[in-house]
Structures are given as structure tokens and as C-alpha cells.
């Protein structure tokens, strides 16, 4: 029978709160991806490292309610609340997708008190690339 390896120190670390809470981020980029089924809001620093994120699904909305403007507004508010506490004052906004939550998420970002340097639509548009899926017959 092998001998157990002795543990040095305790199993729990002495850290209280999250590891990323210590960073001060004065400027960031807010990415909003609004599809017809869900809205995902990701906040990164200027180098592209994710600081905070939220989606309509993680906010408790299920099924078709995830694609609603109110769900997008709630997701944007949740993602931004944490970075405002970390000291973010200025942000750029990149909006992608055709979903219903585009305007609602942008409205929630504007109301958060962040100074927006610009808002850019980065929805990918094909230059006659792949063939689209066939139309639904209901």
C-alpha cells in the first residue's frame, strides 16, 4: 500500500471574491451579439481579454423569451454592472446580428453612465458567399 502524500497548507486559498476584480479598467469594448434566439453581451478590455459577459439565457430567460428586447436589456445591464464597479468610464460598442435585442441593449448601455466613444455595426455581410438555407414552408 502506498503512503499518502502529505498536504502542505490548507486546501482553500485565502482569496476573497473573484480573481479578476482587482484589475482597474478605464476603457473597454462592449460586444453585443443579437441573434433572433438570444442576445450575448461581452465586455473586454482594449486588448480583447474578456472582463465580463452575460446573455439572456444566463439571466433566467428560457425559450423564445431569450430573443426579446427586455431580455437583451437585462443581459446588457448585468454585464455592465460588474465593469462599472471595476472603474470603467469609457467604452466602444460593437453590435453584431439582426436580432430584436440590438436597440434595447444599446439603450441599456447608454443608461449605464458609461461614456461611449463610438457605436459600430459589425454585422457580417456576405459578398455573395455561401448559399443561404432554403426558405421555410409553414
UniProtKB/Swiss-Prot annotation:
Region (Disordered) location: 1-22
A Pfam family matched by this chain, by name?
Ribosomal_S11
Q: Which GO terms describe its molecular function?
A: rRNA binding; structural constituent of ribosome
Please note every region of biased composition (Basic residues): 9-22
Spell out the GO cellular component terms annotated for this protein, sorted alphabetically and separated by semicolons: chloroplast; ribonucleoprotein complex; ribosome
Q: Which GO terms describe its biological process?
A: translation
- Report the locations given in the UniProt record: Plastid, Chloroplast
Q: Which UniProt keywords are present, listed alphabetically? A: Chloroplast, Plastid, Ribonucleoprotein, Ribosomal protein, RNA-binding, rRNA-binding
Q: Which family does it belong to?
A: Belongs to the universal ribosomal protein uS11 family.
* Record note on quaternary structure: Part of the 30S ribosomal subunit.
HAMAP family for the chain: Ribosomal_uS11
Output the PANTHER family linked to this UniProt entry: 40S RIBOSOMAL PROTEIN S14/30S RIBOSOMAL PROTEIN S11
Q: In its UniProt entry, what is this protein called?
A: Small ribosomal subunit protein uS11c
Organism annotation: Piper cenocladum (Ant piper)
Amino acid at each position: 500500500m502506498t503512503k499518502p502524500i502529505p498536504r502542505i497548507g490548507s486546501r482553500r486559498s485565502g482569496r476573497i471574491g473573484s480573481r479578476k476584480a482587482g484589475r482597474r479598467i478605464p476603457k473597454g469594448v462592449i460586444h453585443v451579439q443579437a441573434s433572433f434566439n438570444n442576445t450575448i453581451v461581452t465586455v473586454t478590455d482594449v486588448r480583447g481579454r474578456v472582463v465580463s459577459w452575460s446573455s439572456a439565457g444566463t439571466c433566467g430567460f428560457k425559450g423564445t423569451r431569450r430573443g426579446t428586447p427586455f431580455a437583451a436589456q437585462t443581459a446588457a445591464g448585468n454585464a455592465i454592472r460588474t465593469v462599472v464597479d471595476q472603474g470603467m468610464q469609457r467604452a466602444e460598442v460593437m453590435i453584431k446580428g439582426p436580432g430584436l435585442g440590438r436597440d434595447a441593449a444599446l439603450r441599456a448601455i447608454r443608461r449605464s453612465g458609461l461614456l461611449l466613444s463610438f457605436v459600430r455595426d459589425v454585422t457580417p455581410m456576405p459578398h455573395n458567399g455561401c448559399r443561404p438555407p432554403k426558405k421555410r414552408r409553414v
